Amino acid sequence: MSVDEKVARALKGTTTVGIRSEKAVVLAADKRATAGNFIVHKRVEKIVKISDYMAMTTAGLVADAQVLADVLRMEVKNYELFHKKRMSVKAAATFLSNVLHSARFYPYIVQLLVGGFDTAPRLYSLDWFGTVAEEEFLVTGSGSPMAVGVIEAEYNPNMDLEELVNLAVRAVFAATRRDTASGEGIDVAVIDRNGITMRHYRLGDVIRLVRP
């Protein structure tokens, strides 16, 4: 099987979203894990805490994502211990980009979003070749075509926190309505100057939120 075929199979599942405002970053992801047409797990955590001010969403091969999360978490912690200050989110994304690029001939099959708060909210995307980009909003996974349409139609950088969370949840929910590889509730990470707050929405909670 070629690398392109492996990538296509690995990324056939999951919807993750990242949205940045002037005061916070919101990451959101569904909870379903699939293997082909089979639902393997219904309570997967696709938002990984990297530090007290940084988190990452994962799409792709679970083992690859877990290894990269552990490597990044260790690098951030070592930096903080050695330099006695926080690593910037940009530096963390750049480090992860270098790791991915160094393995480009036998790549980690992942799509990642790294969100955090240093001097301001930051949001970066990374692909399996190490390409890194900073944006106001980003989506990954097989449900991304549906999710990005919701965000593009309604995003405003001046949104307050609850509006931002609501938009992220509705974007992921829209994906779950059309993408069979996404579903089973939504996890949300809110990252601002006070740190990371996790929210967990079951399907009933999501429906009440998007259809008040």
Curated annotation (Swiss-Prot):
A biological process from GO: proteasomal protein catabolic process
Keyword NAD: no
Regulation: The formation of the proteasomal ATPase PAN-20S proteasome complex, via the docking of the C-termini of PAN into the intersubunit pockets in the alpha-rings, triggers opening of the gate for substrate entry. Interconversion between the open-gate and close-gate conformations leads to a dynamic regulation of the 20S proteasome proteolysis activity.
Top-level taxon of the source organism: Archaea
Propeptide: 1-13
Keywords on record: Autocatalytic cleavage, Cytoplasm, Hydrolase, Protease, Proteasome, Threonine protease, Zymogen
EC number: 3.4.25.1
EC top class, as a word: hydrolase
Localization in the cell: Cytoplasm
NCBIfam families on file: arc_protsome_B
The protein's name: Proteasome subunit beta 2
Species this chain originates from: Ignicoccus hospitalis (strain KIN4/I / DSM 18386 / JCM 14125)
Gene name of this polypeptide: psmB2
